[in-house]
Amino acid sequence: MRHLAWLAAVLLLALVVTLPAQAGTPTDQVRQYTDQVMKILENPELRSTDKRAAVRKVANEVFDVTETARRALGRHWNGRTQAERDEFVTLFADLLERTYISKIDLYGGERLKYTGEVIDGDYALVRARIITNKGSEVPVEARMLKRGDQWLIYDIIIENVSLIMNYRTQFDRIIRTASFQELVRKLKDNREQFMTEKAGRSS
């Protein structure tokens, strides 16, 4: 599940569309990044660090991390100050990067096949299937929200399991059994541990 989740997060930036889409649709918004991301992932001259930096830049443009963080925190969001929200969004964005973008080296040529989309006002659902190297297909959905004239991804669903709901369950458990401050501490500790291990690998 973790492998498919990060894979979908990256590949949704490089959605292979097999059906024509009308101008201005959520699919069109995602398609803008297709050539860009695939060239990054498949460029043998780019180092892993360069690929991660390039994919991170694209991800920042197509993912609404603040919305994802807000929904992941659920009912606990409303009780937080603006400073606490800002800090949490930053920590959550770092967590997503460590969980998904840092693993782009695992990319092995998988593709996404577009299967449809549903638009309801400022919300949209883009459906696709991950095509693995063995030919099997895994259903994936991207939930999107319109911000101005741009459609942004705020949730990814793999085989009916939501990225947001997965994190919400974990975060809610920590807050209920301890506190919001404990959640923040854990996220900071996780980030520090990752940076320490990263420094050790590069030394």
Name every feature range the model reports, one short phrase each.
Residues 21-23:
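Boundary at the C-terminal end of the N-terminal hydrophobic targeting segment
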Residues 97-138, 190-203:
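Surface-exposed, charged secondary-structure patches
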Residues 94-95, 132, 159-163:
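Solvent-exposed loop/turn segments at secondary-structure junctions
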Residues 25-100:
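Early exported N-terminus immediately downstream of N-terminal targeting peptides
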Residues 155-203:
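Low-complexity, intrinsically disordered terminal/linker segments enriched in charged
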Residues 7-18:
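Bacterial N-terminal signal peptides
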Residues 137-165:
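Short beta-strand edge/turn micro-motifs at domain boundaries
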Residues 1-5:
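Positively charged n-region of N-terminal signal peptides that target proteins for export
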